[in-house]
Amino acid sequence: VTERSGLVGTGGGKGPSGANASLIRGRYVLCKAHNDHELAVVQDGAVLQVDGRIEAVGAYDELARRHPGLDTIGCLRHVVIPGLVNTHHHVGLTPVQLGITDMPLELWLSARLYARQVDGYLDTLYSAFELIGSGVTAVQHLDTMRPAPVSAWPERGHAVIKAYLDIGMRVSYALCIRDQNRLVYAPDEQFIATLPPALARETADWLSKTHFRLEDYETDFLEPMIGAYSGGRENLTRIWLAPINLERCSDELLLLTKQWAARHKIGIHLHFCETHYQKLYAERRFGKTAIRHLHDIGFLGPEVTLGHAVWTTEDDIDLIAASDVRICHNASSNLRLRSGIAPVRRFVERGIPVALGIDEAGLNDDRDMLQELRLVKHLHCAPGLYDEPLTAAQIFRMATENGARSIGFGDEIGSIEPGKRADLVLLDYDRITAPYLDPAISPIDAIIYRARNTDVDTVMIDGKIVFQDGRTTRIDRSETLDRIARSLDVPLQPEEVARRRFVHAIFPHIRDFYVDWTLPKPEPFYAVHAMR
């Protein structure tokens, strides 16, 4: 057997009854978080996978003795971890790549209309390369690209899902929907009435093209998509629901979503209180906090994940904890768009499951999930000798088990234990620890503090190697990037020109809309500076 980058074998021999089986070996196998401070770790360990399912975890010598003749993937230079889960993701080419720099969310959402139109399949492959290359094996794809009419939505969904399946990733796919307040946090007609006549007519015409009947969503999109992917293609796909947020969804739509989730036994991902303007919207519209309103209409429940949840009060957190809701923390996005910092430590203290998402892109304008773990570790530290920051074990759980549960794969992935699917990542531990690392530093601390996407050696999903030696095994990355470049190396299409002109015209009016939306001086959960 030829040794390649420290790997022995190429992905599986024949196990019992001719099954595809292999041993995945590492100096350490990090199985799961026992608690907030400890991980289950096997030293010089291995994972036995048979037909994509983990059959055993234990000492390598013992498993090799019991199962002679199997290919061994990995060696003592590696550490084996569960595949990471990105619980909040939208696009491939980043907004910056498409001409939109960071700005507050309420302006940035409108500026996104400036972007070039990118083929959905190729665009998804682009981000999938980056995700897999940083150890992500499953993703919650929240698709905001809704072509008109509704009948075109399944084709869009199929293209995105096909990209993930072709590259070998797990995906929970949701098409984001909305039915009100589509440009600002006020009724469309009310905002249009403030615009100059010509721009008002253009805005009304543009909004009319995005209208759909709520009942059509279930019959024309949701049910066909669930039928197309239920149990198919190695069971790598889930179809999820994503009402975009409280501000842009009527109570009718939110409650319909709740009914659809119950009827089809699927989950919901809702963008929630991302900015202080969204916090103010709920107070102005309902006379109470956003979470209190969702509670009062019966929306909250264990099938719901709230994305962001930056501007939550102490009472809000009590309601979230009592409702068995999950939260997805998007640290990079909240910093880049000046949204704030979610009180993640308070969530954890209250026992609320927190997952992690990179959103559109991380701080480096890429999808390095390992860097995102490090950011979360350092972001939630307050000054002082007696502050207790998040532990490495807590962050590890967020990026694995909690993420898996949030996107509908909780019974299948998120930990390394018998019965789970073999979604595994081999990191080059020699590179992470070079030239020296004191033995007092645990493997998970070494990963959180030092690992980068360049340390990802091999990624296995469902027992199949999808990334090795710095490249994906199923799709040629260079060829795909060339195709993307060629597709955009053309003059702007008339529709793109019209959208850009519309953005330039409407943008000042959107900015002016929020001029008197002033947030009272907040009392933060933990302070990082003081004026005096």
Question: Residues of each region from the PLM?
Answer:
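Active-site gating loops and adjacent loop-to-helix segments of metal-dependent hydrolytic enzymes
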Residues: 95-123, 149, 181-212, 276-301, ...
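C-terminal regulatory/interaction regions
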Residues: 478-482, 486, 499-532
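Metal-coordinating catalytic core of metallo-dependent amide/deamination hydrolases
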Residues: 153-307
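N-terminal metal-binding scaffold of metallo-dependent hydrolase/deaminase domains
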Residues: 1-66, 78
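His/Asp/Glu-enriched, well-ordered alpha-helical/loop segment
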Residues: 296-303, 345-433
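Alpha-helical scaffold segments that flank or form the walls of functional sites
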Residues: 98-170, 217-234, 485-487
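C-terminal cap of metal-dependent C-N hydrolases
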Residues: 35, 421-481
